[in-house]
Amino acid sequence: MLILRDIKQKHRIRNTEQLARTCDFLLDNIGNIVSLRSITAGLCAAGLKMSEKTLANYVEYLCSAFLLYRVRRFDIAGKKYLSSGDKYYLVDHSFRYAKLGTKKLDFGHVYENMVAIELIRRGFEIYVGALYKKEIDFVAVRRDEKVYIQVSDDISSETTFEREISPLLKIRDAYPKTIIARTRHETTDWEGVKVIDIARWLMGLEDWL
């Protein structure tokens, strides 16, 4: 990957395997909550040891090169940022397939990554919402606008739909709440939560705020 070569040259990195394996780990965990400790442990279990300080530098280099975007977690009820665990999203998901192959196709995380990057493109700051023991995929903020978003591949089953909508229904403020999924239908409203087809949302065909 040319980006890794540029990072190696810019920061004069000698141990290129550490950088490459750090990149692979993050690409393989797009949309998962990770920490420096969990990444270090995962790499160590795979036979590669490095300090958390070195790892932090590599992660910062990857983000500074705009290959990855770090998204922090936000406690919705407590209205504060959480210090442990972040998510990382890839500027272009094709980089993941080019680096790791296409055997592991997780469309839920693919769609989540697409929505994250599109929100950033539209000028939103995004956070992962934590509400009690539930998770909101995105809290998106732009000036005085705020919206809570869940992203899913398929919500046709009652169990999956309930899993996605229940955290949104627990939020007590009046900001918009939306589920973006592969529905292939017109937008619907469920107890104040908009359910929007991801293709229509990406094309900007829906009024979702």
What do the predicted segments below correspond to?
Residues 1-146:
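Accessory nucleic acid-recognition modules appended to NTPase machines
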Residues 119, 137, 149, 168, ...:
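Hydrophobic, well-ordered secondary-structure elements that form the walls
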Residues 92-94, 130, 152, 181-183, ...:
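Residues at the C-termini of beta-strands that transition into short coil/loop
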Residues 131, 172-193:
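Nucleic-acid nuclease catalytic cores
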Residues 89, 149, 178-180, 194-196:
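Hydrophobic/aromatic beta-strand patches that form the interior of the parallel beta-sheet core
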Residues 184-209:
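Domain-level recognition of nuclease-like catalytic cores that cleave nucleotide substrates
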Residues 146-156, 164:
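Active-site ExK catalytic segment of metal-dependent nucleases
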